[in-house]
Amino acid sequence: MVIVGFPGDPVDTVILPGGAGVDAARSEPALIDWVKAVSGTARRVVTVCTGAFLAAEAGLLGRTPSDDALGLCRTFRPRISGRSGRCRPDLHAQFAEGVDRGWSHRRHRPRAGTGRRRPRHRDCPDGCPLARPVSAPTRWADPVRGSGVDATRQTDLDPPGAGGHRGRAGGAHRIGELAQRAAMSPRHFTRVFSDEVGEAPGRYVERIRTEAARRQLEETHDTVVAIAARCGFGTAETMRRSFIRRVGISPDQYRKAFA
């Protein structure tokens, strides 16, 4: 690891990426000292996936609520509290539990810093839109263009919200129906699904519905009631409770911040 130097002026945003090299990076005292020094004067610190471990090693988190990091959150505890999928534009420290969530932060951080009225696309080498759907990280997930994932490897175990079902997030995806579709008993289906995805089917469905509702809040002028019905929540109150659990703010607050 080579430390080029310290910036002459305070930086606005420090981004700590994750990946396979995080464990080695955490053992580099010079790097950790650099992160501490630069983050101390930055307006915000953003971590992507296991980059949160760098922030933890540098002592930046304290009791900050942090995202799940795909099941690795338990290693933070007890010093750092963990909650999955929270989006807090007002926090100094921002967390992204994976690469896809990191793209979401990439989109929202410039808007939070310079105002809401920003284009939904930016010039970048891969031409990526700033508005990007979030998918699960396993065979249950959508194939991602350019990721090397072969769409033909998708199986009959695909849950609602993944692959061809993503457009039907509002369907009645009950455990019994999903298990029957996968030719499994409900108990076995729940166990296999949880092992591969890292969360129970019911929580996965709620997450997919929440992501679908987030996109509609950002991209349409439909009412919260209409979006809740379309995304499978049934009522606006059910959708509000889901947003509070997963996003940390209500649908109305989310729309005001990101639409």
UniProtKB/Swiss-Prot annotation:
Disruption of the gene: reported phenotype: Cells lacking this gene exhibit reduced survival both in macrophages and in a mouse infection model.
Pfam entry (one): HTH_18
UniProt induction comment: Repressed by Mce3R.
Residue ranges occupied by any HTH araC/xylS-type domain in the UniProt entry: 174-257
Composition bias, Basic residues: 104-121
GO biological process: regulation of DNA-templated transcription
Region of interest (Disordered), residue spans: 104-170
PROSITE patterns: HTH_ARAC_FAMILY_2 (PS01124)
Function: Controls the expression of genes important for virulence.
Name assigned to this protein: HTH-type transcriptional regulator Rv1931c
Species, as recorded: Mycobacterium tuberculosis (strain ATCC 25618 / H37Rv)
Native organism taxonomy: Bacteria, Bacillati, Actinomycetota, Actinomycetes, Mycobacteriales
